[in-house]
Swiss-Prot record:
UniProtKB keywords: Acetylation, Cytoplasm, Glyoxylate bypass, Magnesium, Manganese, Metal-binding, NADP, Oxidoreductase, Phosphoprotein, Tricarboxylic acid cycle
PTM comment, free text: Acetylation at Lys-374 dramatically reduces catalytic activity.
Top EC class for this record: oxidoreductase
Post-translational modification Phosphoserine, affected residues: 389
Annotated positions binding NADP(+): 75-77, 82, 260, 310-315, 328
Chain positions with N6-succinyllysine modification: 126, 400
Name of the molecule in the record: Isocitrate dehydrogenase [NADP] cytoplasmic
Residues noted as binding substrate in the record, renumbered to the chain: 77, 94-100, 109, 132, 212
Amino acid sequence: MSKKIHGGSVVEMQGDEMTRIIWELIKEKLILPYVELDLHSYDLGIENRDATNDQVTKDAAEAIKKYNVGVKCATITPDEKRVEEFKLKQMWKSPNGTIRNILGGTVFREAIICKNIPRLVTGWVKPIIIGRHAYGDQYRATDFVVPGPGKVEITYTPKDGSQKVTYLVHSFEEGGGVAMGMYNQDKSIEDFAHSSFQMALSKGWPLYLSTKNTILKKYDGRFKDIFQEIYDKQYKSQFEAQKIWYEHRLIDDMVAQAMKSEGGFIWACKNYDGDVQSDSVAQGYGSLGMMTSVLICPDGKTVEAEAAHGTVTRHYRMHQKGQETSTNPIASIFAWSRGLAHRARLDNNTELSFFAKALEEVCIETIEAGFMTKDLAACIKGLPNVQRSDYLNTFEFMDKLGENLKAKLAQAKL
């Protein structure tokens, strides 16, 4: 490969702490030597978010809307301690939440699999991609303690002034208890369905939606009906052309099936199920350091990719003291590769598509050849048994990836 690949417009968002350092190394060693990008950079480091009253996060989200591709470094979501540490004006909200609220869409998490990294669920040879509907249900519910005997009712008051409808939830006869009212909106469920179908088409894998519609006949039944209607009208022929399928499953059946499967499917989960299952699936694959997170918008055009982990504060503290660190950059690299792969799809850019695939292959091949960071060595040998010779430090590993990428691209006839 003699000339740089023209890559088009990408919005990149810098982050915090150890991941911020790794982010710059990724650009310097793995991306910019080979790809000429129209980079639109936004500094989402905590100090800059504070200085701009978090306007920079909103600006970044609007830029992603405009250019359709965003890649994001991990960022600090401040708690009381962080407010004190950085002398912040206020406890700013999660940038991921802010971006998601502006763009809409669904977050899909996917494990990066290497043959030599052991998995807790040994049968999972392909990723299981979990899409969580991050709106409504328990997370926007009104719950309360019922202090004593009495009735709990739910009332719907139509906006047009027509007759109210009241439903009895429960008559408390002997003492009190607890009660809850929760909701979701058709528009949000429709967007969730479109994002899920788009993800399945882009991966070429089947899609399953899990609910408990046998118990929540109206509530979960609505999810089931909306997905089915959209699938039949807009996606069925595309799925059949790719020889993939969509099915609804009961959540308990789905959990059991997932455990027995080899992976290789998209799993659309309601909010609470997605919260729980995404963590259990991540652990089943062995490491959060090997987990990508992609936000897919319902338009199928707009995508934002990032690592599914945090800013690796502990390593950053060591780095600040001049101590050696061995921080895993793989999920952050895959944020770039997934973003660039999407840019390539939008622009029909075969060279960029080849580069994104080569970058991911180099990461996996390097680890499978025995060159890795300490966390992965610990997955293989167990942390107490890891010796210094078993792993590379942060910078050595990045250099190794750079060297292997250079060699791989040198062989390519682009």
